[in-house]
């Protein structure tokens, strides 16, 4: 067996929502860093992926990010697509670049936006404040890169609202920064929201619940969905909101 570049760690668990010899879709739990870095050398999602698909990911190599095509913030839970072969990675990378991959998030926000549906079109720039060390922050800035997030309000009460967001671009912390910029910060966001809003949920109330793409080899449409996360269901109850996936059970 070839030496693996990333240390496999079977203790890092994740759910497999879809698996094919060329591609997999997994569900990342909140609190899990996507890939190794300072302070997280062997306890990341990628370490767990290597425990399951180490040989395939090793063959892809660092040039193909060991199969990683996109990432989720540490605090965010939800679906990620993983390439298991080079041909699949290259084809899916093109789909991401041409914005053909469809990603949908559920976000529990402080209040309802002015319109029930819309597209937030505000450029985003990155910075690295000294007080946060190497951690990057995103902000709305005219000098930033183009960023668009489509959204629709699923339900709203006087206490809060549930929104489905579809990022059309892939900027750092895009959904979080965009909703904060229109006065609808996501509950539990300890990075961008004031204290009371950050404390209103056990963690960032953001979940990547649906992922759609064209299978890179068969050409078939793949549309994967996940359930509303258990650790955020109590927040919905407190706000008087219904689970968006309740009818599927």
Task: Mark where each language-model region is.
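RNA pseudouridine synthases
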Residues: 1-249
């Amino acid at each position: 067996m070839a030496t693996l570049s990333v240390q496999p760690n079977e203790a890092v668990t994740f759910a497999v929502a879809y698996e094919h010899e060329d591609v997999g879709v997994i569900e990342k739990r909140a609190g899990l860093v996507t890939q190794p870095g300072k302070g997280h050398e062997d306890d990341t999602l990628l370490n767990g992926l290597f425990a399951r698909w180490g040989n395939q990911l090793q063959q892809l190599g660092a040039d193909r990010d060991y199969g990683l095509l996109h990432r989720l913030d540490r605090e965010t839970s939800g679906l990620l697509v993983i390439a298991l072969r080079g041909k699949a990675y290259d084809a899916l990378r093109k789909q991401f670049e041409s914005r053909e991959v469809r990603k949908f998030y559920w976000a529990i926000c402080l209040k309802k936006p002015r319109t029930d549906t819309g597209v937030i079109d505000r450029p985003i720039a990155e910075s690295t404040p000294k007080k946060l060390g190497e951690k990057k922050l995103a902000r709305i800035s005219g000098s930033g890169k183009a960023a668009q997030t489509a959204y629709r309000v699923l339900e709203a009460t006087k206490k809060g609202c549930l929104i489905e967001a579809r990022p059309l671009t892939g900027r750092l912390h895009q959904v979080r920064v965009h909703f904060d910029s229109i006065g609808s910060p996501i509950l539990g966001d300890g990075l961008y929201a004031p204290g009371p809003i950050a404390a209103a949920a056990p963690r960032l109330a953001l979940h990547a619940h649906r992922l759609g793409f064209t299978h890179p080899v068969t050409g078939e449409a793949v549309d994967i969905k996940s359930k509303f996360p258990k650790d955020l269901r109590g927040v919905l109850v407190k706000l008087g909101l219904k689970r968006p996936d309740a009818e599927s059970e």
